[in-house]
Amino acid sequence: MKFLFAAGGTGGHINPALAVAGEIREKYPDSEILFVGTKDKMESKLVPQAGFDFATISISGFQRKLTLKNIAKNIRTLFYLISSSFQTKKIIRDFKPDVVIGFGGYVSGPVLRSAYKMGIPTAIHEQNAFPGVTNKALAKHVDRVMITVESVRKYFDSKNECVLTGLPVRGEMLRADRDFSRAEMNIKDGEVLILSMGGSLGAKAINEAAVELISKRADEKGYRFLHSMGRYGLWVPDKIKENGVDLENHPNIEIREYISDMDVCMSAADIVVCRAGASSLSEIEALGKASILVPSPNVAENHQYHNAMALVNNGAAIIIEEKDLTGDRLIKEVDELARNKSKREKIGENARAMAMIDAKSKIAEIVVGLAKNSKA
């Protein structure tokens, strides 16, 4: 069987696709898998690193804010749309896939359109609680629409019923053990670990609120802090020191630029403060963590807000919109969770109840079924 995956732009699109491709490769070692993406985005590194073949097309997204610069970019995008149609058809003719799967990002558009016009079975997966423009348009034509959360179903006008699959979670997250992780981080019984992060770049609003939280609660009995400041947050340690905290010698505060052992840190945490990207929320659900979510307002269709509300509406998270985020507001919410164990645990239990830890195998099963039917 031959599988062609289209995913690009961000890790939120690429990593779930890689997880499913890995599942197929493990169960069907004789299968052939090809990814299609762009040469200058994240997929051009992540896909080859995962050991999959990779083909490129020229494509970019439309700029919605109309400026002279963006109008020029949109004209170039129109040209790319025409050329990418020829590129994708050639890739499909050469590879001859049994099924084509799109995981979002603008690269999915031309690949899936070419595939369904050529009569090849197609499927898409929507990671967010509000669909992207590309997936919404494709849903009317593809054979299967797979969704991460139930609340997104109403936004799709698809020719087939949407299938609820969840979102694949990394294996190391599912294997993480809370007691082992807390012992590794030297967290004592009764201590509450507050894990805060604003992504690999470092969201300014989260960094500023976290600085106030850590500075004002540095000596609060039973509080432990681990904060990821990101690439653009290197000012954070100096600001905490300016606020009178002896950061180098403080036993209960750790500041990192990036957290590479997220499985250990998140499994050890009692409270997680973060953005509301789909992958992060699936991990929070899988580990059953109480979370305070600050959706990014700078994403397409404001989808992080919808992602967060899917949990909030089930009593599985607390939301603070970025426009409402202050140090004092974050302190209030953290204090309430840190000092109220039963509330913290209830939110975590509600989050765990939303987890779909078999998402990877479920998606792979659907995709393989389409491939087998194409051969029948």
Language model features with spans:
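Conserved nucleotide-sugar phosphate-binding/catalytic loop shared by glycosyltransferases and other
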Residues: 3-10, 30-83, 198, 231, ...
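Short amphipathic alpha-helix
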Residues: 13-24
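Donor-nucleotide binding loops and adjacent catalytic segments primarily
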Residues: 46, 178-180, 187-272, 305-309, ...
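Active-site-proximal region of nucleotide-activated glycan assembly enzymes
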Residues: 53, 116-179, 187
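Glycosyltransferases and closely related glycan-assembly transferases
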Residues: 87-100, 107-123, 136, 140
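Acidic donor-binding loop of glycosyltransferase active sites
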Residues: 97-99, 259, 263-282, 289
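A short, well-ordered alpha-helix in the C-terminal region of glycosyltransferases
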Residues: 343-357
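C-terminal alpha-helical cap of glycosyltransferases
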Residues: 357-376
